[in-house]
């Protein structure tokens, strides 16, 4: 008996904890059963079905004082009164109070799901969240849509922080929920009346961030498949460059999809904000200094020299972004290449990984490994482009096997600083994983770097306030923090995407197409969208390379654009044909179609299949070897370049 009672009490407690409505239902059922039982007993005792005396005793214990005047036995009336005291005066009040406490607690913890429609759904609450909310507020103004934020963290803590940041008026449009975005059932509940836009953010420093976001995106595709709903604007944030690499091989587009998707690689976006948009402080329009200073023209003797310390994801992003944009006319006229130096202790393994990742680029590149032995003797290994491909890229690489604090690297940096404005424009990006160590490294560099005003960019993923203060001093005026997570989503990203869409529309116009920018953009796969973004990123660099009149330098800048395009394609994983293969391909395409042999047709089909399947591109060649039709595309791009930044 004791065990049965204990089991009953456990189940009752669990039911009360897990569901507030169940407790109320059980209570009211118990009251009704007791009341009808009492009514039956009353009928047996006095033959009366009237319920009013029973109700009176249940609701008002004071009514027991007049029990002697009633025909019911006093003992029976006492039993009803005691039951009423226990259930109505004590338990019912407690249950109702607990009910409202539970409602409030569920809201605070983010358990309650508001019945939103046509809202903005933000899955995750990483450091980009505040800027996304500011962007929505700025674009929508007083008509700001309802926003639902789903976080796997503490919903109440997040809500309180947002109230402090944005105020109660804005928070009246925002609800914070707790949930896991990668769960299909969770996403189905959140999007039962699907949002008009969804941001897949994730949380800061969460494991398997990209895998969770891509899984969530796949769940969304499943929910939308075959459903007649309005189109959803979707933004997917990725943190790993390998995720972007994989997406390059997907051929899907948004042309007939119910989801319009924009992928943002957070690490690459930090690098583009630093080197392309160059927005140091948005509130006063202060810019980061350009790697190319005021511009590099055909007559310039200087080339860009970017030194990047650390072999980290942000270091790779900064280095490859520089390789995307730093292409100048003086390579055509004087053979001056952009130089990118990567510095790290025990660099061998990371260097091999980096070279393997961009194997097709390094097959055509000049690069070298610089190190010092135990006696301080300098050792240098030089690598040349493979002879079968040719030597035509305008980027060269250095890998330096030493710590930035080592005497050898400090001497080397001092030598580079002495060459600044004479044979190169030196810039330094400190990109280690440890933000505190990055600050220390930036403060104790060779004195000549500060004296010669060499730009020093310091990666600060959390807060940049320490270096902001340092930047305001005379000694450290050339120190610039970058990469703060809160800056990842900002107006500069949208501006770059807009230029990319205009560039794609310009290219389509050259091919005789006339759809609008958004329709054309939807028809592109991830690789082509990325290519257009990279082309847009280089526009400002080209405009700074013009001496007087753009029309006088079209051919020169067209060659510069093709040099940039070569590196872009190689960074994306495309490979070039060998010289022998290029000669064979040119011989086939220069033969009239009617005159081609069967063997030539089969070989041409193999070339085209290799381009689609293996990313082999036959236009990765020196500009002089390019077909006239391909050259015309570069020329028209240059002629219309001002339209892209209107």
Question: What is each PLM-predicted segment?
Answer:
Residues 552-556, 592, 600, 646:
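Preference for protein termini
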């Amino acid at each position: 008996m004791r065990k049965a009672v204990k089991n009953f009490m456990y189940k009752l407690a669990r039911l009360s904890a897990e569901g507030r409505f169940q407790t109320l239902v059980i209570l009211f059922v118990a009251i009704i059963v007791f009341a009808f039982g009492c009514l039956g007993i009353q009928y047996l005792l006095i033959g009366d079905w009237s319920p009013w005396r029973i109700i009176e005793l249940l609701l008002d214990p004071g009514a027991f004082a007049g029990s002697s005047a009633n025909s019911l036995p006093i003992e029976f009336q006492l039993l009803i009164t005691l039951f009423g005291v226990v259930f109505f005066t004590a338990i019912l009040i407690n249950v109702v109070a607990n009910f409202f406490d539970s409602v409030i607690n569920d809201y605070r913890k983010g358990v309650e799901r508001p019945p939103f429609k046509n809202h903005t759904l933000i899955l995750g609450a990483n450091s980009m969240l505040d800027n996304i909310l500011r962007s929505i507020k700025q674009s929508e103004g007083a008509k700001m849509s309802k926003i639902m934020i789903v976080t796997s963290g503490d919903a109440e803590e997040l809500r309180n922080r947002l109230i402090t940041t944005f105020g109660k008026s804005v928070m009246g449009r925002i609800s914070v929920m707790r949930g896991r975005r990668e769960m299909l059932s969770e996403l189905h509940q959140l999007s039962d009346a699907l949002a008009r836009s969804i941001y897949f953010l994730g949380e800061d420093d969460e494991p398997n961030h990209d895998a969770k976001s891509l899984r969530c995106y796949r769940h969304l595709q499943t929910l939308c498949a075959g459903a007649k709903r309005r189109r959803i604007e979707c933004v997917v944030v990725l943190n790993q460059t390998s995720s972007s690499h994989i997406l390059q091989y997907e051929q899907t587009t948004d042309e007939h999809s119910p989801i319009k998707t924009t992928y943002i690689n957070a690490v690459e976006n930090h690098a583009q904000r630093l080197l392309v948009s160059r927005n140091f402080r948005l509130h006063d329009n202060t810019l980061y200094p350009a790697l190319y200073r005021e511009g590099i023209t055909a007559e310039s003797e200087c080339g860009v020299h970017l030194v990047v310390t650390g072999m980290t994801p942000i270091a790779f992003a900064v280095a490859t972004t520089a390789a995307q944009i730093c292409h100048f006319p003086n390579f055509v006229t004087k053979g001056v290449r952009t130089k990118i130096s990567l510095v790290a202790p025990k660099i061998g393994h990371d260097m091999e990984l980096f070279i393997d990742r961009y194997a097709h680029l390094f097959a055509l590149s000049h690069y070298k490994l610089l190190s010092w032995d135990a006696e301080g003797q300098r050792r240098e290994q030089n690598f040349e482009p493979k002879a079968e491909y040719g030597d035509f890229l305008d980027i060269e690489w250095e890998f330096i096997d030493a710590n930035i604090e080592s005497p050898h690297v400090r001497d080397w940096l001092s030598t580079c600083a002495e060459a600044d404005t004479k044979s190169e424009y030196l810039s330094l990006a400190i990109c280690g994983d440890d933000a505190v160590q990055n600050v220390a490294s930036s403060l104790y560099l060779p004195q000549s770097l500060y004296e010669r005003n060499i730009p020093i960019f310091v990666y600060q993923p959390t807060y940049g306030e320490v270096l902001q203060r340092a930047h305001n001093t005379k000694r450290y005026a050339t120190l610039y923090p970058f990469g703060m997570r809160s800056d990842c989503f900002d107006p500069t990203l949208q501006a770059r995407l807009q230029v990319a869409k205009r560039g794609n529309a310009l290219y389509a116009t050259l091919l005789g197409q006339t759809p609008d920018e958004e329709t054309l953009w939807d028809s592109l796969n991830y690789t082509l969208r990325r290519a257009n973004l990279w082309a847009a990123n280089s526009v400002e660099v080209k405009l700074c390379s013009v001496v007087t009149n753009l029309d006088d330098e079209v051919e020169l800048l067209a060659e510069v654009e093709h040099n940039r395009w070569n590196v872009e394609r190689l960074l994306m994983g495309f490979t070039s044909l060998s010289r022998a293969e290029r000669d064979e391909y040119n011989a086939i395409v220069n033969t009239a179609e009617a005159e081609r042999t069967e063997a030539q047709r089969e070989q041409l089909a193999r070339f085209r299949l290799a381009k689609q399947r293996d990313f082999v591109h036959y236009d990765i060649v020196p500009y002089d070897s390019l077909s006239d039709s391909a050259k015309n595309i570069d020329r028209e791009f240059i002629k219309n370049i001002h339209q892209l930044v209107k």
